Amino acid sequence: MVLIRVLANLLILQLSYAQKSSELVFGGRPCNINEHRSLVVLFNSSGFLCGGTLINQDWVVTAAHCDSENFQLLFGVHSKKILNEDEQTRDPKEKFFCPNRKNDDEVDKDIMLIKLDSSVSNSTHIAPLSLPSSPPSVGSVCRIMGWGKTIPTKEIYPDVPHCANINILDHAVCRAAYSWRTVANTTLCAGILQGGKDTCHADSGGPLICNGQVQGIVSWGGHPCGQPREPGVYTKVLDYNDWVQSIIAGNTEATCPP
C-alpha cells in the first residue's frame, strides 16, 4: 500500500508533523541545528502539514499534494519546544502547479512552487538551497530530513527534525517494488535496499539533498515506511528546473515536462 507523505497531527503549542505521503524520517538521528537552514514547515491550525525547501528569499518548493487551505510557512525552526530567535513566518502569496498535471493522480508532477508574501531574511538558521545543476548518479549518498514518524507503525514524532543518509537507486528497484502503479521518469528512486531508513508520515514535500543541492522532493513510498526493497519515490527537481525558473521570471504560462 502506498502512502503519500502529508500530516495531520495536533499542534498543541508544539507542532507535530506530516506524513511521506506525509512521512517522517525513520531510522535517522536528530539533525544538527545548523544543517537544515533551508528546511521549511507548512502548517495550519491543526498542526504541521508538510516540509518544503527555501530556494531563494521569495520562493519555496514543496510537493503538490501538500496543498491545503489557510496554511502558513515557518522558517528557521529546530525544536518544537524551544524557539529560535530568528524564526520567521510567511503567508503564501501565490501557488503554482504544473498546468498539465493529472487531476486524478495526486502524485503526478508532484511539485508546488510557492511565492511568499514577503522576502525571508537569511540568518543563522535560515538560508536557501540551490536548485540542481546536474542529476545525481546511482549510488550517490543523499540526505533526507524532517519531523516525520520515527517509528513507522506508531504515531511518534520527534521534537527536532531527524536526518539520515540514503542512496540513489536504479529506477528499476522502484518499478519492481510498485509494479501496480506507474513510477514516472521524472522521479528519483532513493532509499536503503535492506530497509531501515526512509522518509515517513509528515515528511512530504521536504528535500532530498545530494551534493548540496535539492535534487528531490518527498512524494510517496511504501507503507509502512522503511521496508526492505520498498524505497521512497521523490519528484526529480532537475526535470522541473526550466519550469521553476520560468515561473520565478514571471512566465506563469510555462508548462512542465510530460
From Swiss-Prot:
Per UniProt, residues of the Peptidase S1 domain are 25-249
Give the source's domain of life in one word. Answer: Eukaryota
> Where can this protein be found?
Secreted
Q: Does the keyword Hydrolase apply?
A: yes
What is any one of the record's Gene Ontology cellular component terms? secretory granule
- Protein EC: 3.4.21.-
Q: Which cysteines are joined by disulfide bonds?
A: C31-C163, C50-C66, C98-C256, C142-C210, C174-C189, C200-C225
Q: What PROSITE patterns does this protein map onto?
A: TRYPSIN_DOM (PS50240), TRYPSIN_HIS (PS00134)
Q: Which UniProt keywords apply?
A: Disulfide bond, Fibrinolytic toxin, Glycoprotein, Hemostasis impairing toxin, Hydrolase, Protease, Secreted, Serine protease, Signal, Toxin, Zymogen
Q: Where is the active site?
A: H65, D110, S204
**InterPro entries on file:** Peptidase_S1_PA, Peptidase_S1_PA_chymotrypsin, Peptidase_S1A, Trypsin_dom, TRYPSIN_HIS
Q: Which GO terms describe its biological process?
A: proteolysis
Annotated glycan sites: N44, N122, N185
SUPFAM superfamilies per the UniProt record, alphabetical: Trypsin-like serine proteases
Activity regulation reads: Inhibited by PMSF at 2 mM concentration but not by EDTA.
Q: Does the keyword Repeat apply?
A: no
Chief subcellular location equals secreted
Which Gene Ontology MF annotations are present?
A: serine-type endopeptidase activity; toxin activity
Where does this protein have coiled-coil stretches?
Answer: none
Family annotation (Pfam families): Trypsin
Summed up, the tissue specificity of this protein is: Expressed by the venom gland.
Q: What does this protein do?
A: Snake venom serine protease that may act in the hemostasis system of the prey. Has weak fibrinogen clotting activity.
Subunit record text: Monomer.
User: To which protein family does this belong?
Assistant: Belongs to the peptidase S1 family. Snake venom subfamily.
Q: What else is known?
A: Negative results: does not activate nor degrade plasminogen or prothrombin (F2). Does not activate factor XIII.
What protein name is recorded for this chain? Snake venom serine protease 2
Q: What organism does the record attribute this protein to?
A: Protobothrops jerdonii
